[in-house]
Swiss-Prot record:
GO terms for cellular component: cytosolic ribosome; cytosolic small ribosomal subunit; extracellular region; plant-type vacuole; plasmodesma. It comes from Arabidopsis thaliana (Mouse-ear cress). GO terms for molecular function: mRNA binding; structural constituent of ribosome. The gene is RPS15A. This is Small ribosomal subunit protein uS19u. It comes from the Eukaryota. It holds the Pfam family Ribosomal_S19. InterPro entries: Ribosomal_uS19, Ribosomal_uS19_CS, Ribosomal_uS19_euk/arc, Ribosomal_uS19_SF. PROSITE patterns: RIBOSOMAL_S19.
Length: 152
């Protein structure tokens, strides 16, 4: 077995790369795109099922309309123009895959390219709204023992 591999490598035959085909809860991407909203909602978690059962308002539908327009106007093989939005609570659905969305984080619009792995998540999960804490040295008065630490 070990002596077979060097012969294959020496022959100059490139090893084919196999890519994992995406599936959401056992359903492949093509089937997700063809699925009706009712069937799609059954695959989502309970929190998102509840959100869909309470109905979609005008705002998320307007965003999807803008995304469709951006995809339609994009040249073949090019990425669509980014669509800016404040709708951080928008749930990512299969129709949005391939779009670029500028998600507002309270200060700027973070551009997020929608990938198949993001289905069923909120847009806010991909645009962090706070700056993570970088802990430095403790200041004076942080602990009782800090009274004995000389000031610089």
């Amino acid at each position: 077995m070990a002596d077979v591999e060097p012969e294959v490598a020496a022959a100059g035959v490139p090893k084919k790369r196999t890519f994992k085909k995406f599936a959401f809860k056992g359903v492949d991407l093509d089937a997700l795109l063809d699925m009706s909203t009712d069937d799609l909602v059954k695959l989502f978690s309970s929190r998102i099922r509840r959100r869909f059962s309470r109905g979609l308002t005008r705002k998320p539908m307007a965003l999807i309309k803008k995304l469709r327009k951006a995809k339609r106007e994009a040249p073949q093989g090019e990425k669509p123009e980014p669509v800016r939005t404040h709708l951080r609570n928008m749930i990512i659905v299969p129709e949005m895959i391939g779009s670029i969305i500028g998600v507002y984080n309270g200060k700027t619009f973070n551009q997020v390219e929608i990938k198949p792995e993001m289905i069923g998540h909120y847009l806010a999960e991909f645009s962090i709204s706070y700056k993570p804490v970088k802990h430095g040295r403790p200041g004076v008065g942080a602990t009782h023992s800090s009274r004995f630490i000389p000031l610089k």
